[in-house]
Amino acid sequence: AGFSDAKEVALGADITADKEAKEFEERMERGDKLMTTSCCPAYVRAVKLHVPELLACVSDTRRPMHYIAQLVKEENPENVTVFIGPCLAKRKEGMDDDFVDYVLSVEEIGALFIAKKIDVARQEAVEHNINDVATASGRNFAVSGGVAEAVRVRLKHPENLRSTVINGLNSAGMKQLAQFGKIQSGAVP
């Protein structure tokens, strides 16, 4: 029992950024006013519940968890995929994705290590396939503004991307979202 391999979800983030950059260019060419990321399931839920007029602006691109799990299943359909991450909103995302079998929080995996008396710092290093190296922008997805930057560096004309970072779904962040909803609905030019 245990894990036989690990893949960095940042590889999936690179795929997401590639696809979101293409989608952004297509949307802007057809005259859309704006596009938002789809990478955070809590953000997408907040838009659905509180700013539904902005929903059409949310990217159709799948999230990094999906793409990395898909790659793992394509290597071997019998592989069991377990996403380990800090965000509890990822649990629902994993439950809704056919390529993801399980989701553990960082806290849960830490508790498992303690229960099994595994000292991670004392474990022998394992060689990893150097072809599976994510880009810096893929690794920075979780940083505030990281998704927008990853998309920007992939655009044919990066100067066309004017990004606004909404850091958190607190009252200030929700007010910013509401303002973008008004722009999308035409209530504000």
Locate predicted features:
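Iron-sulfur-associated redox domains of electron-transfer enzymes in respiratory
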Residues: 1-189
